[in-house]
Design a protein with these regions (language model features):
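Cell-envelope and extracellular/periplasmic
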Residues: 1-176
């Protein structure tokens, strides 16, 4: 419909699928910012509590969408009092520089969000990064971020991942 033009396509189609499966209206809240890093969606305390990561790199964001805690404060906290039954997440492209920390950061993010909503079992589903044609070092780091996403899956209960390797459009970073 025309009313969803600015809404996340992934979020819209996921919500539509839920509606068809459940047969009841489904409300969706979108909190997204293109090109953001995972650290921006976390508190500084959660980053500090994440073991084994390069904390200096994790806290080195300089743009609004990469500054630790900026998007958590501005886009997560304002909606955390709403009833929610789960999360979907499609992010990671901007963490190619610190792919080696992505698994630990994603595990910590899920823990933080579940604590924020007061439900340690809230489902968390996410999308594998698409096979986009990056260049140079970022081309080499893409499969490493994807591997980190799958390794995180093994440590996050009540979670799932949507594979995108079969989409076959290397010129579109977010294929629909």
């Amino acid at each position: 419909p025309a009313s969803v033009g600015q809404f996340s396509a992934v979020g819209y189609f996921f919500g539509r699928m839920l509606y068809k499966a459940l047969g009841i209206p489904v409300g969706l809240i979108t909190s997204n910012w293109g090109g953001s890093t995972i650290e921006a969606w976390m508190t500084v305390d959660a980053i500090d509590a994440t073991p084994g990561i390069d904390h200096a790199v994790a806290k080195s964001g300089t743009y609004d969408n990469s500054i630790p805690q900026r998007l958590y404060n501005g886009m997560i906290l304002p909606v955390c009092r709403y009833t929610a039954k789960g999360f979907i997440w499609y992010q990671g492209e901007s963490n190619r520089k610190n792919w080696y920390d992505y698994k630990a950061l994603q595990v910590s993010l899920v823990k933080l969000w579940r604590e924020t909503w007061g439900d340690g079992k809230m489902p968390f589903y996410y999308t594998q990064l698409a096979p986009y044609r990056y260049e140079g070092d970022t081309l080499r780091s893409l499969p490493l971020v994807i591997e980190a996403q799958y390794r995180a899956l093994a440590e996050i209960p009540h979670s799932g991942i949507a594979a995108t390797t079969d989409l076959g459009n290397p010129t579109c970073i977010h294929p629909a």
